[in-house]
């Protein structure tokens, strides 16, 4: 198999096995993104880097889906992190929806690398590269938005739960129509399959709690940073 086939084959095999070196490398990159996002979030070049990386990743991935007429059960953007990629990248300005998906994208990226569930293709297939670089770009774009434009008044806990349950209800319907496993609502990892309705409730509750926790951690960090700034000026 030549390099072109490795990149773009439609023949599913099995997902790559991630070893210790991979985990060390990925989490080093994640730490670097957290640090640089905090330090360079106001730099246009830094913002553009992650925006361009995300755009290229999405164009290549969905171009590959389209050219190869991949089934709707796999090729629609209804995975949580992919929805976040589109919203954080394309939605302009400050809004509760962009903020919600930036919080989701921050947690989702960490979860995706702690417990990776990539597509069944060999490395460096476009789907595997998209999984890696797409999530890294999502984290960068999400952190830049949250560190620059976060507004705690936009999203309270109740709204987070309502938005998550509403979003997953949409994904639930898409899965019924396409036979897919978007949002891992059909076969949730870790907890296993407990039936469609129970899966929906479990995933929605867990995701709502995770986004809420991410929100609280961010607010605590921003509060501490504000106190440091006040102390410096005093």
Which positions does each model-derived feature cover?
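Aromatic-anchored segments of alpha-helical transmembrane domains
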Residues: 54-64, 105-118, 164-175
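Membrane-interface transmembrane-helix boundary segments in multi-pass integral membrane proteins
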Residues: 10-26, 156-166, 176-215
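Alpha-helical transmembrane segments in multipass membrane proteins, preferentially the mid-helix core
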Residues: 31-39, 88, 137-157
